[in-house]
C-alpha cells in the first residue's frame, strides 16, 4: 500500500493552529467567555498533542507526538507564540505568557550569524531564512516586549525587522 493513499489520522500543526487563531479572534471581538472556555478545554489540549518535550528547546512539532518525530518549523511556532501573547494581553493569565516565552526560546535557537542574522524556516533543514519566519518573528518579539517590558525582546524584534528589510 502506498503511503500517499493513506490520509493522516490527525491534522498537521499548521492547519490545526488556525483553530487557536480563530478562537482568539472570536474571544477578542466578543469577550464572550465561552470562547475562552473553548480555548482552554478543547483547542489548547489538542495543541499540546504536538508539543515536543523530547528535544530541546521544547517546541511544537509539525505532527502529533505519538507519531515518529517530525520536523519543527520556526514559522509555525512563531504564529503560536503570537497567539499565546495575544491571549495573555487580553486575559492577563500568566500561563499564556509563559508558553509564549518558551516558544521564543525555540525561535532564538533558530538564529545564527550566517547571512548577518535571521531565523531559519525549519529546525531540521537549516537551508533558508525566509520572510515567513522573520517578519512574524519580529512581531512576536515586539509583542513580548509589550507584554513584559523586557528590552531584550525589543532589541531582538528590531534586529529581525532590520534583517528582514535587507
For the regions a language model picked out, list residue spans one by one.
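Glycan-recognition and catalytic cores of secretory/periplasmic carbohydrate-active enzymes
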Residues: 1-166
Amino acid at each position: 500500500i502506498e503511503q500517499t493513499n493513506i490520509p493522516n489520522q490527525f491534522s498537521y500543526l499548521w492547519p490545526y493552529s488556525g483553530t487557536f487563531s480563530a478562537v482568539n479572534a472570536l474571544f477578542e471581538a466578543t469577550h464572550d467567555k465561552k470562547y475562552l472556555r473553548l480555548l482552554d478545554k478543547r483547542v489548547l489540549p489538542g495543541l499540546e498533542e504536538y508539543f515536543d518535550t523530547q528535544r530541546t528547546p521544547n517546541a511544537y512539532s509539525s505532527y502529533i507526538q505519538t507519531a515518529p518525530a517530525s520536523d519543527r518549523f520556526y514559522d509555525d511556532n512563531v504564529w503560536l507564540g503570537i497567539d499565546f501573547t495575544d491571549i495573555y494581553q487580553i486575559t492577563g493569565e500568566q500561563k499564556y505568557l509563559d508558553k509564549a516565552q518558551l516558544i521564543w526560546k525555540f525561535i532564538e535557537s533558530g538564529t545564527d550569524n550566517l547571512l548577518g542574522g535571521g531565523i531559519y524556516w525549519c529546525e531540521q533543514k537549516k537551508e533558508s531564512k525566509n520572510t515567513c519566519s522573520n517578519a512574524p518573528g519580529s512581531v512576536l518579539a515586539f509583542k513580548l516586549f509589550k507584554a513584559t517590558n523586557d528590552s531584550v525582546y525589543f532589541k531582538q524584534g528590531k534586529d529581525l525587522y532590520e534583517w528582514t528589510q535587507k
